[in-house]
Amino acid sequence: MEFDLNTEIAEVEEEENDDVGVGVGGGTRIDKGRLGISPSSSSSCSSGSSSSSSSTGSASSIYSELWHACAGPLTCLPKKGNVVVYFPQGHLEQDAMVSYSSPLEIPKFDLNPQIVCRVVNVQLLANKDTDEVYTQVTLLPLQEFSMLNGEGKEVKELGGEEERNGSSSVKRTPHMFCKTLTASDTSTHGGFSVPRRAAEDCFAPLDYKQQRPSQELIAKDLHGVEWKFRHIYRGQPRRHLLTTGWSIFVSQKNLVSGDAVLFLRDEGGELRLGIRRAARPRNGLPDSIIEKNSCSNILSLVANAVSTKSMFHVFYSPRATHAEFVIPYEKYITSIRSPVCIGTRFRMRFEMDDSPERRCAGVVTGVCDLDPYRWPNSKWRCLLVRWDESFVSDHQERVSPWEIDPSVSLPHLSIQSSPRPKRPWAGLLDTTPPGNPITKRGGFLDFEESVRPSKVLQGQENIGSASPSQGFDVMNRRILDFAMQSHANPVLVSSRVKDRFGEFVDATGVNPACSGVMDLDRFPRVLQGQEICSLKSFPQFAGFSPAAAPNPFAYQANKSSYYPLALHGIRSTHVPYQNPYNAGNQSSGPPSRAINFGEETRKFDAQNEGGLPNNVTADLPFKIDMMGKQKGSELNMNASSGCKLFGFSLPVETPASKPQSSSKRICTKVHKQGSQVGRAIDLSRLNGYDDLLMELERLFNMEGLLRDPEKGWRILYTDSENDMMVVGDDPWHDFCNVVWKIHLYTKEEVENANDDNKSCLEQAALMMEASKSSSVSQPDSSPTITRV
């Protein structure tokens, strides 16, 4: 039997006989286990007294909050009376997770891809076998709204109704905590370790005057079943534990390491209990519902309800379905009123394993129907997207317009399938988001560069150019080849720079008068000492500064479909070398030019580098040390000493410190009882407590001893304040941030830590003091021993 956790039970009882009640169209009423409360509570609810009504409302609120906590932070359900849009495609997508029938074999029944309905009832349910939450929404098709296109007075009036009857946010109580179970929590002979703050906030206060403070806790799950636990404060160090009754709960719920347990306490002090499994179900619905709701049955019931203007039921599993298929009408209208274009940057919320909510960014790469033959003009997953982060692509490559949040701070990308007219990139600065290291306004590359690499300077060859654009491409490829080789093997750069640049200068064959790409007034000091040509006729490049690129690969890492930002800087900047000595140069020595290597400017001596011009730099976003560390440091000192303004020296940004000073705590020390030599372990290379236990067993040749609590070993750790705690009580990331040293002790040693006899902890402290007095080595601070 399933349990109804309807949040509006009082409202349902009052409005059951309204014109939008369940009696319309022969719909069925479901009165099974409402709210999942005991029969006495249900009977008191029907009595109609004010006291019972208030208690029922309180129980409804806490159960609703528990249901939403188990469903996840992104679950949003409509309220009774809302106007929504139902998508049969999404409903079939949920059913297809456990159905093996081909979508082409399912008749369409001439249904519209979007059906406007009114919500008659919402029931929050839970699967008794798996504790997975799901909901049953009763919908009534509205024929008068089926042809609305998002414009007109009707929409405005409906928007006001939506504001009055829209879905309200669930009230969140502060007395709630959620913990991911560790291996020790799921052990049959262990207990559930509760964080101190969570225990003090959610559980009743303990009497700490007792030698072993303890109490009995009674918590109800989603089905109204009571679970009794013994809450005790004990151990060395002291901690909150749920002991008696916990192993029974773990075994009956089939909990494993990685599952999450939620505890909530309402205003009356009642405790509620829920679980959220780590493995998402293929379908959280009960088997009885799955058997009756096949793909063909779903569409036939919906088609019959639309034709007869009667109600139909929709079952929705929030943890098994990636997208909701019952959308608020106003949300749908807002999404189609402002159509999404190709190249639109957006953000979308996801529920990740490592965080309850995360916003991921992406770009729209296409707009087309998911199934143009069976569901033409459908808005369901009509957007093809590409994500900035690779792990998001595993979730979905198609989204719906109402799921995304187009941001004005992330402008559009130019994604065109046809060739552009032959003109310079006038809109480059208008299509880059903030933070771009090239333009100082941020952004991504023009998407067209990934599909047309040979059309870099299309049209620019007609502006004062003496050679075709292919010559520029050859020169740019040579710049890229040189930069890539020098970046991969910087040691050989200083010895090969003469030959490589010599070959590059001889092979380019580009007229110096045709390098017009950048405005010298907007790009100062790039051509120091000379101007090859005047580029003031190119105002579209105003403000474009590739020289200011500190890390050009920060925005498109591991994205093979985009050119990195480095390529854009290389392919857009051209440094001719055919005539390195300008006839108009009046200086006795060779002229100087600047080629920016992205992070710093290197000065080249013509005599030391085989006749290369002084101050040669290139717009290559790679850090290439061509002069060696000693000469580079001297040049940096000379450069810093010459920075003055009105006779006053300007502060120069100090270079980053060496890696030795920033990585002083890479490894964590591990000490084992009975071992005089410790070990070091790098926690950053581990993914969780399971990896930590395996690594510790490998270091000390203790295979199978640490992962099994029955073997008699305990793992403790101390933080920077010398407080000793048990490994596994805190989340993994918090543990990695505070751990200072890990200790491996036997069970007997931990239990006898407060005895009069000296423990190995005291012996370790004495050894540390002895080593400190002898000045043999630097001792570690040992934990403080407190005798009771």
Curated annotation (Swiss-Prot):
Tissue spec: Expressed in the whole plant.
Keyword Nucleus: yes
Disruption phenotype: Double mutations in this protein and in ARF3 protein significantly suppresses the adaxial development defect of leaves of the AS2 and RH10 proteins double mutant at high temperatures.
Notes concerning its domains: Interactions between auxin response factors (ARFs) and Aux/IAA proteins occur through their C-terminal dimerization domains III and IV.
Pfam assignment, any one: ARF_AD
Compositionally biased residues, Low complexity: 38-53
GO terms for biological process, alphabetical: abaxial cell fate specification; auxin-activated signaling pathway; vegetative phase change
Chief localization: nucleus
Localisation: Nucleus
Lineage, top ranks: Eukaryota, Viridiplantae, Streptophyta, Embryophyta, Tracheophyta
A Gene Ontology term for the protein's cellular component: nucleus
Residue ranges of the annotated DNA-binding region, renumbered to this chain: 177-279
Domain spans labelled PB1: 665-747
Acidic residues bias: start-end ranges: 1-19
UniProt gene name: ARF4
Entry GO MF terms: DNA-binding transcription factor activity; transcription cis-regulatory region binding
Assembly and binders: Homodimers and heterodimers.
Keywords: Auxin signaling pathway, DNA-binding, Nucleus, Transcription, Transcription regulation
Protein origin, superkingdom: Eukaryota
Protein's name according to its UniProt entry: Auxin response factor 4
Function statement: Auxin response factors (ARFs) are transcriptional factors that bind specifically to the DNA sequence 5'-TGTCTC-3' found in the auxin-responsive promoter elements (AuxREs). Could act as transcriptional activator or repressor. Formation of heterodimers with Aux/IAA proteins may alter their ability to modulate early auxin response genes expression.
Region (Disordered): 1-53, 413-433
Family, as annotated: Belongs to the ARF family.
